[in-house]
Amino acid sequence: MIDQIIDYNRSFVERKGYEKYLTDKYPDKKLAVLSCMDTRLTELLPAALGLKNGDAKIIKNAGGLVISAFDSAMRSLIVAIYELGVKEIMVVAHSHCGACHMSYDHFHHEMIARGVTDETLDTIRKCGIDLHHWLEGFKDTPTSVRKTVETIKTHPLVPKDIVVRGFIIDSETGALEEIC
């Protein structure tokens, strides 16, 4: 698959397909969106929000969550605020999210089946990494949105004037429901 993508990319560049996407690094709407990496949202999310290339910083991860105050999603939001001029943040989870059903037991079984040893997992635990917490999903989407919004709003590095709001998008219709 990657080779096909590389071939397509050569053609894209040769025909100057990039020209309609040219913009700078600063989001025109001074907006950051934290959302899930679900494939159903790849085109639906920006279309449903009326966003085009250059409008917003879109940060995606499994579940659209901030799981700790200093994880990579939070780092990206801090960079967006201080380096890129973001003034508003939307946390956008979605209906029927697979992260809702993630379980450490499933991941553990799959990792062992694919060659990760118990010794490796023990080493990770001894380094202070809680794989149960890191790989466990959430049980309730609205609660996870509220928790992520609260983590962002109360972060010691997030200025008080930054607007942070939480939503759930219907992964079929694109309809937004404001949670907080």
PLM regions and their residue ranges:
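Gly/Ser/Thr-rich loops at beta-strand to alpha-helix junctions
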Residues: 38-40, 95-99
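Short Gly/aromatic-enriched secondary-structure transition segments
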Residues: 46-51
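Ordered, amphipathic secondary-structure segments that act as subunit-interaction surfaces
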Residues: 82-94
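Short beta-strand segments
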Residues: 34-36, 60, 92-94, 167-170
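Structural motif
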Residues: 30-33, 56-57, 87-90, 165-166
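N-terminal low-complexity or amphipathic/hydrophobic leaders
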Residues: 26-40
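Divalent-metal-activated hydrolytic enzyme cores
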Residues: 1-29, 64-72, 81-84, 99-180
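A short, structured active-site edge motif that brings together acidic residues
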Residues: 57-64
